[in-house]
Swiss-Prot record:
Keywords: Endoplasmic reticulum, Membrane, Protein transport, Translocation, Transmembrane, Transmembrane helix, Transport. This is Probable protein transport protein Sec61 subunit gamma. The chain crosses the membrane at residues 40-58. Heterotrimeric complex composed of SEC61-alpha, SEC61-beta and SEC61-gamma. It comes from the Eukaryota. It is a single-pass membrane protein. The keyword Transport applies. Residues 1-39 are cytoplasmic. GO terms for molecular function: protein transmembrane transporter activity. GO terms for biological process: post-translational protein targeting to membrane, translocation. InterPro entries: Prot_translocase_SecE_dom_sf, Translocase_Sec61-g, Translocase_SecE/Sec61-g.
Length: 70
């Protein structure tokens, strides 16, 4: 019984230990890396916005034809 409890308690300890090791290895991105990531995210936003706009642009007239003016 005590072994089972010990095994259950070991899981959070190992998780915490691994998490601390991971945080210690992490580092902040330098300026060049940050700018590159920001540009990639911005490009993604623009592309997704354009796709959404085009879908809406096509959907509204198509909906008017199929459903009629409500």
């Amino acid at each position: 019984m005590a072994d089972q409890i010990q095994e259950i308690l070991d899981v959070p300890r190992e998780f915490l230990k691994d998490g601390i090791q991971f945080i210690k290895k992490c580092q902040k991105p330098d300026r060049r890396e940050f700018i590159k990531i920001s540009q990639a995210v911005g490009t993604g936003f623009l592309i997704m916005g354009a796709v959404g706009y085009l879908v809406k642009l096509i959907h509204i007239p198509l909906n008017q034809v199929l459903v009629g003016g409500a």
